[in-house]
Regions:
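Predominantly extracellular/secreted and cell-surface proteins with exposed
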Residues: 531-598
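C-terminal segment of classical bacterial N-terminal signal peptides
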Residues: 14-23
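Hydrophobic residues positioned within well-ordered beta-strands of beta-sheet architectures
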Residues: 66, 111, 217, 379, ...
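Beta-sheet ligand-binding and adhesion/scaffold domains
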Residues: 581, 588-643
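N-terminal segment immediately downstream of the Sec signal-peptide cleavage site
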Residues: 509-548, 553-554, 626-643
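Bacterial N-terminal signal peptides that target proteins for export
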Residues: 1-9
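Feature marking well-ordered beta-strand scaffolds used for ligand recognition
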Residues: 26-509
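Short, surface-exposed coil-to-beta transition loops
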Residues: 107, 212-213, 526-528, 594-598
Length: 643
C-alpha cells in the first residue's frame, strides 16, 4: 500500500524540482563542411523560394550525406509512396507501407531490399502476407524474429498479425504464421526476447462511449506458429486519481518495454488539439504524458497476469494544473501537440531514460500557415526513480519556438515535427536520431543528457510525386547498422535512403585504420601491393595514407597521391561486403603515370593461419580500366577500429 500513497503525492505535487523547471534545449552545433548544403533560414525551416524552384526542392544537409537510395517504384514506374516503417537485418532492409491505395497491387506490401551494396540498394521481392500488406509502426525485428500487424483495424474485423523468421538468407524470410489480435494495431512492440507482443489500437470508440474498449492488448508469441492472446487492458484499470486525469485522452499511441520486459512504457496521445482528437470529455483538459506500468506478470507468465501502475508523468503545460510534472515556458496554455513515440534506452552513463516525441497536425502538414501552433518537441526523461520520472532536456528546433512565429508567417516557412526516433545503441545511447517529417532527419548528441546538441541533419530532395511547393517528409524510426555506421531512413515519396554522418567523432567507421601489404598470385607473376590509411588525432583528424600496386603481367602501376574517403564499404567491391572488419578507401593518383581515380576495398579476416583469408579489391573508377581482386598469397592486411 505504500506505493499508491507515494504516487498520489507525486501526482498532486505543486512545485517543480530545479531540474524540471529549467529544461535545456538542444541547440544546433552543425558546422557545414565540404559537400554540405545547409539550411538558409531558421533551424528546421524551409522557405517558399526553396520549395518552388524549378524541379522541386533540391535537399539540404549538414554533417550527413546520402550513401544510396531506392525510390521503390510501383507498377506505373512512380514512387509507390506511403512509407510505413523501415527495419534492418544482416544485409537486408525491409520497407513497409502505411496506407496503400490498393491492397491488390503486387507492389503493395513490405519490400525486401538487398543492401550488400549500400550505394545501390535493390528491391528484390515483396512480402504480401495479410499483415505485411499494410504494416506501419507495429513492424518490429528482435533477434531473428520479424513481426508485423495490419495498421489500425483490419478489413472485416481481422486484425492480422504475421510472424517471420530471419536467417542467413535474409532476402527470403521464413513465414511462420498469421493470426489475429484482440483489437487494432496502430503501433506495437515485440519484447527483446521475442516472446511477447504489445499492440496499441488507435481510433474507434472513446472510453466514455465504450468503457470496455481496449487500450493495450498482449499476445504470447513464444510459439511462433501459434500465438496466444494473454490479456487486454484499458485505462479504467488505473488508480482512480490517475484514471480521472487521463480519461480525456482519446488514444494511447506508442509502447515499449525495458530489456527484460518487466516494465511497460506507454504514451498518452492527449494533446488539446485536432490531432489529439480534442479532449473526449469536452473538458478542454490536456492529458499528454508517459505512463509506466509493471509488466512482470506478463514477462514471467504468472497466472491471471495484470499490468500494474507505477507512475504517470504529465507534460500538460498550465502552471495551475495540479498534476503537472513538466512546465514548458514557451507554451503555457495547455494546447500541446499529441504525445507520439516512447522508447526505453540506457544512456552511455549507465542510467535508464525514456525518449519521447510529440506530433501535431501542423507539423505533419508542414504548412507555414499553421506551423506556429504545432507545439512539438522531443523529451529525454530520467527514469532512475520510476515513481518520479524527470524531464531533463528537450529537443526543440527553432521552427517550433514562438519567438519565430512572425518570421514563419512572413516568409511562409514550412516546418515539421518530431515523429519517430532511432538510436546508435539502445543500451549505450549517445546519439538520438529524430525523423522530423518535413524538417527531415535530425541527429542530436545526448552525451551530456542535460545539454543536448544537434550535430547533423538531412532533408531529402523532392521526387517526381512530391506535390508542387512542398518537400518530401520522413516519419519512420531511423534504423542503425552499427557495423557499418549507416542509418536506414524512410521517406514518404522518396523511398529508402541510406545515410551516414560525416564527422568521424560520430561515425566510428571513419575512425578505422588499415595497414598492410603483400602480393596476389596472377599466373606465374605476382601483383604486389602496399597500403596504409588512417586519420590523425586518434582517428578524428585529417585523412592521410598511401596505396601502391604493381601488376607486371597486366602492365599496371597504381600510385595514390590523395585519399578522398576512408570508411565502411558502400560501393560494389566484388566479394567484399560491408562488415565491421572491412573498409573502403577511395583516392586519386596515377595509373601508369596518367591521372586516374580508384576504389580499394580490403577485408581483414584475422590472424595468419585462419580458415578464411584476407581479401583485397582494386578498381579504377575514372581515367583507366583495371580491376583486380583476390586473397593475398603472401603478406597481411590489418583493419583496426579506433575508439
Amino acid at each position: 500500500m505504500k506505493k499508491p500513497i507515494a504516487l498520489a503525492v507525486a501526482l498532486a505535487a505543486m512545485a517543480l524540482s530545479p531540474l524540471a523547471a529549467h529544461q535545456a534545449r538542444a541547440e544546433s552545433f552543425c558546422t557545414p563542411g565540404p559537400g554540405d548544403r545547409p539550411e538558409t533560414t531558421i533551424q528546421g525551416g524551409l522557405t517558399l523560394a526553396e520549395r518552388t524552384v524549378p524541379g522541386g526542392f533540391q535537399g539540404q544537409w549538414c554533417g550527413a550525406r546520402e550513401v544510396g537510395h531506392n525510390n521503390l517504384l510501383n507498377e506505373q514506374g512512380l514512387p509507390r509512396g506511403s512509407f510505413g516503417d523501415v527495419q534492418f537485418f544482416g544485409h537486408c532492409a525491409y520497407a513497409s507501407m502505411r496506407d496503400p491505395s490498393n491492397l491488390a497491387l503486387e507492389s503493395t506490401g513490405t519490400a525486401v531490399l538487398d543492401v550488400r551494396v549500400p550505394s545501390n540498394p535493390v528491391w528484390v521481392r515483396t512480402l504480401r502476407t495479410p499483415a505485411m500488406q499494410r504494416a506501419y509502426s507495429a513492424f518490429e525485428i528482435q533477434k531473428n524474429i520479424m513481426i508485423s500487424a495490419f495498421k489500425d483495424f483490419g478489413p472485416s474485423g481481422n486484425n492480422w498479425f504475421d510472424i517471420y523468421e530471419l536467417g542467413d538468407d535474409c532476402l527470403n524470410p521464413v513465414f511462420r504464421s498469421t493470426s489475429t489480435t484482440a483489437s487494432g494495431n496502430h503501433d506495437g512492440w515485440l519484447s527483446p526476447d521475442t516472446n511477447t507482443y504489445y499492440g496499441i489500437p488507435f481510433g474507434g470508440q472513446t472510453i466514455q462511449q465504450n468503457p470496455n474498449r481496449i487500450d493495450v492488448h498482449v499476445l504470447d508469441t513464444t510459439d511462433k506458429a501459434h500465438p496466444v492472446q494473454l490479456l487486454n487492458w484499458n485505462r479504467n484499470q488505473l488508480p482512480p486519481e490517475v484514471r480521472d486525469r487521463v480519461v480525456p485522452t482519446r488514444n494511447f499511441h506508442d509502447v515499449s518495454t525495458n530489456d527484460d520486459g518487466t516494465r511497460l512504457y506507454l504514451d498518452l496521445y492527449g494533446g488539446n488539439n485536432a490531432l489529439g482528437g480534442f479532449p473526449a470529455d469536452g473538458s478542454g483538459r490536456c492529458a499528454n504524458g508517459l505512463i509506466i506500468m509493471d509488466s512482470s506478470d506478463v514477462a514471467f507468465r504468472r497466472p491471471n497476469p495484470q499490468l500494474r501502475f507505477i507512475s504517470f508523468t504529465s507534460w500538460c503545460d498550465p502552471k495551475n494544473d495540479p498534476g503537472y510534472h513538466y512546465y514548458d515556458p514557451d507554451f503555457d496554455d495547455g494546447s500541446t501537440a499529441a504525445a507520439h513515440a516512447t522508447e526505453y534506452i540506457i544512456h552511455e552513463n549507465g542510467k535508464p531514460y525514456v525518449v519521447t516525441t510529440d506530433e501535431s497536425a501542423a507539423g505533419l502538414d508542414g504548412d507555414w500557415s499553421v506551423v506556429c501552433r504545432q507545439r512539438t518537441f522531443g523529451r529525454l526523461i530520467d527514469i532512475s526513480d520510476e515513481t518520479h520520472p524527470r524531464v531533463v532536456s528537450t529537443f526543440k528546433p527553432d521552427i517550433g519556438k514562438p519567438e519565430n512565429c512572425q518570421r514563419i508567417m512572413t516568409e511562409q516557412i514550412n516546418g515539421g515535427m518530431i515523429h519517430y526516433i532511432g538510436f546508435d545503441d539502445r543500451y549505450h545511447v549517445r546519439l538520438v536520431v529524430y525523423a522530423g517529417a518535413n524538417y527531415g532527419i535530425r541527429v542530436v548528441d545526448y552525451r551530456d543528457p542535460e545539454h543536448p546538441k544537434e550535430i547533423a541533419y538531412y532533408k531529402a530532395p523532392s521526387v517526381v510525386t512530391t506535390a508542387a511547393g512542398e518537400n518530401d517528409f520522413t516519419r519512420p524510426d531511423p534504423r542503425y547498422d552499427a557495423d557499418n555506421c549507416m542509418w536506414y531512413t524512410g521517406w514518404n515519396q522518396g523511398g529508402l535512403r541510406i545515410l551516414e554522418l560525416t564527422n568521424p567523432e560520430y561515425n566510428g567507421c571513419m575512425r578505422r585504420a588499415v595497414n598492410g601489404g603483400g602480393f596476389l598470385q596472377s599466373g606465374k607473376s605476382k601483383v604486389n601491393f602496399g597500403l596504409q590509411a588512417a586519420r590523425g588525432d586518434g582517428g578524428r583528424g585529417a585523412l592521410s595514407g598511401s596505396f601502391e600496386l604493381n601488376d607486371k603481367e597486366a602492365g599496371a602501376k597504381i600510385h595514390f597521391e590523395q585519399l578522398t574517403l576512408l570508411g565502411s564499404v558502400r560501393d560494389a567491391c566484388g566479394a567484399i561486403l560491408p562488415t565491421a572488419n572491412a573498409v573502403q578507401i577511395d583516392g586519386t593518383g596515377t595509373f601508369n603515370g596518367a591521372p586516374a581515380s580508384f576504389r580499394v576495398c580490403v577485408q581483414d579476416s584475422g590472424q595468419q593461419g585462419r580458415e578464411k583469408a584476407d581479401r583485397i579489391f582494386v578498381t579504377c573508377t575514372a581515367g583507366c580500366s583495371y580491376t583486380k581482386e583476390g586473397e593475398p598469397a603472401g603478406g597481411n592486411i590489418e583493419v583496426a577500429q579506433r575508439p
